[in-house]
Amino acid sequence: MRHGMSGRKLNRTSSHRKAMFANMAASLLKHEQIKTTLPKAKDLRPIAEKLITLGKGGTLHDRRQAHAILRDDAVVAKLFAVLGPRYKDRQGGYSRILKAGFRYGDAAPMAVIELVDRDPAAKGLDSGPTAEANDDDSEE
């Protein structure tokens, strides 16, 4: 019997699952909205909520705990400088999951997980090389 067992295995080893959710949490906090499968979004939500609660605390211990999960200095800095103060008056419920149809190819249910009161300008911010960056390199 699996009474009281929370979370899904998602056909991954525990280390792969831990790394995947750390990367997904960092992406969610960085871009404030990501698209993924519905089961992954449902498992990511409590991780992200706990990280934002740490960001509201702001102590050195909270910062170290967040860094142990995220492993990204820029995202940890944003968590404590931007997201923590933004949600200081909200008692939980920092994210929402919206269903986004089914994926072409395997018909997996997709979802968009986003932060409540998100900044629309953060979406896609610093997400990799762009055409503008390539043009700047060719001019040198």
Curated annotation (Swiss-Prot):
Keyword Ribonucleoprotein belongs to the record: yes
The record's GO molecular-function terms, alphabetically, read: structural constituent of ribosome
One GO BP on record is:
translation
Instruction: Enumerate the UniProt keywords alphabetically.
Output: Ribonucleoprotein, Ribosomal protein
- GO cellular component terms, A-Z: cytosolic large ribosomal subunit
Residue segments, region Disordered: 121-140
Disulfide linkage: none
Question: Does this entry carry the keyword Metal-binding?
Answer: no
Query: NCBIfam families under this entry?
Result: L17
Q: Which family does it belong to?
A: Belongs to the bacterial ribosomal protein bL17 family.
What quaternary structure, including any partners, is listed in this protein's UniProt entry?
Part of the 50S ribosomal subunit. Contacts protein L32.
Protein's UniProt name:
Large ribosomal subunit protein bL17
Q: Which organism is it from?
A: Rhodospirillum rubrum (strain ATCC 11170 / ATH 1.1.1 / DSM 467 / LMG 4362 / NCIMB 8255 / S1)
